[in-house]
């Protein structure tokens, strides 16, 4: 399995670097809601392409929050990933 993961990610290095650069260049200061929301929309596109079930939690004064889940019908403990 470890080798499979290595091949999977190694084969996508250019794509991952491109996406990381795009997201960083979007400039989304925490205090500027519309820029954070624009970033949330872009990240949501990527998550949807990966098969995530999503809920966007609207916020009035700060950027919206994405809650993304995969395989919720499968057994096993969930994994929590928080990003800022």
Q: How would you describe each model-predicted region?
A:
Residues 2-84:
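Acidic/His- and Gly-rich active-site-bordering loop/insert found
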């Amino acid at each position: 399995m470890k080798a499979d993961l290595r091949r999977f990610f190694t084969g996508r290095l250019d794509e991952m670097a491109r996406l990381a650069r795009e997201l960083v260049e979007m400039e989304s200061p925490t205090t500027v809601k519309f820029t954070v929301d624009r970033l949330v929309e872009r990240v949501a596109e990527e998550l949807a392409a990966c098969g995530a079930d999503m809920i966007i939690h609207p916020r009035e004064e700060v950027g919206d929050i994405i809650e993304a889940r995969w395989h919720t019908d499968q057994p096993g403990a969930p994994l929590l990933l928080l990003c800022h």
